């Protein structure tokens, strides 16, 4: 059977921009989103498969009760550095702890190619920032695949780097969905009540039938056309992906920034906050307007 339902679950700011990477949004917000994903994925009519970034391991405890093959991870860094499995809230999965795939597209193709006996119905969930969701949305538009889009929208802007997505990757119409209520004494209860919880469907691309036929004919001709022996193209990562701080020549940001005279303890260098690995902050977003 293969994949019958595809869901993309992510975060949006007031400008409908996604955080570029996981470290560009608050760990508390990712933890809440992953918890909601686990609740929504508990559908009785299919097997849920949740794809997430590897650097959300310490926040993805609600997903770890799923069987290992149904909770694959993607190492979304564009560099080939060894995974950081020990330091910070955005530490990655240890080797062999979870099933690894190249990206969400590879997971979708694998599930479609899988032919177990008896056939299984898969509900695919792609949960993460732009470095995971944007390449998959581009692929879905290319193959004319409809996607259910589920998001938590904040009224502020991201602390880190945002990634604006084309409007064709967003649903035209959305309705509200109800999150699983937080405990009455939850420290983020008041803050989470200010957010919008949006659900919509991203429709497939509007390519005409003639264009699809021409593309099919070109691919058929290319199969039988002789090609000179040339080395294969070098694989490059998607532009949305970003290397680690060491590859960019920047030092790791410590947990506590030293204070200097005239600066408060909560003030951090805005250059470090945007370009480097975001330090741990007590808030989720920078308010755009001053109260």
Curated annotation (Swiss-Prot):
Tell me if Acetylation is a UniProt keyword of this record: yes
UniProt xrefs under InterPro entries: Herpes_US2_varicellovirus, Ig-like_dom_sf
The UniProt annotation puts the region (Disordered) at: 251-270
Keyword terms: Acetylation, Host cytoplasm, Host nucleus, Host-virus interaction
What happens when you mutate residue 80 to C? In strain: Nonneuroinvasive mutant HF10
Q: Which Pfam families match?
A: US2
Q: Where is the signal peptide?
A: none
> Which residues are annotated with the PTM N-acetylglycine?
2
Task: List GO terms (cellular component aspect).
Answer: host cell cytoplasm; host cell nucleus
Q: Where in the cell is it found?
A: Host cytoplasm; Host nucleus
Q: How does it assemble?
A: Interacts with host KRT18.
Q: Which family does the UniProt entry place this protein in?
A: Belongs to the herpesviridae HHV-1 US2 protein family.
Q: What is this protein called?
A: Protein US2
């Amino acid at each position: 059977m293969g994949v019958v339902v595809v869901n993309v679950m992510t975060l949006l700011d007031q400008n409908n921009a996604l955080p570029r990477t996981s470290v560009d949004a608050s760990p508390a917000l990712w933890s809440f989103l992953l918890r909601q994903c686990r609740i929504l994925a508990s559908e009785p009519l299919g097997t849920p498969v949740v794809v997430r970034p590897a650097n959300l391991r310490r926040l993805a405890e609600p997903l770890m009760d799923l069987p290992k093959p149904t909770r694959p991870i993607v190492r979304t860094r564009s560099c080939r550095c060894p995974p950081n499995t020990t330091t910070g809230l955005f530490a990655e999965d240890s080797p062999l702890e979870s099933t690894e795939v190249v990206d969400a597209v590879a997971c979708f193709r694998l599930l479609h190619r899988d032919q177990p006996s008896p056939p299984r119905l898969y509900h695919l969930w792609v949960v993460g920032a732009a470095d995971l969701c944007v390449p998959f949305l581009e692929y879905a538009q290319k193959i004319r695949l409809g996607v259910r889009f589920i998001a938590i929208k904040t009224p502020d802007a991201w602390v880190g780097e945002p990634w604006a997505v084309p409007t064709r990757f967003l649903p035209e119409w959305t309705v509200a969905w109800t999150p699983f209520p937080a405990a009455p004494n939850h420290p983020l209860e008041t803050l989470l009540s200010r957010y919008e919880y949006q659900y919509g469907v991203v429709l497939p691309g509007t390519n005409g039938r003639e264009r699809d036929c021409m593309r099919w004919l070109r691919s058929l001709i290319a199969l039988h056309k002789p090609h000179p022996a040339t080395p294969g193209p070098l694989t490059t990562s998607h532009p949305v992906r970003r290397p680690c701080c060491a590859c960019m020549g920047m030092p790791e940001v410590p947990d506590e920034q030293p204070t200097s005279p005239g600066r408060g303890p909560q003030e951090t260098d805005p250059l470090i906050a945007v370009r480097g690995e975001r330090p741990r902050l007590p808030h989720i977003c920078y308010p755009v307007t001053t109260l």
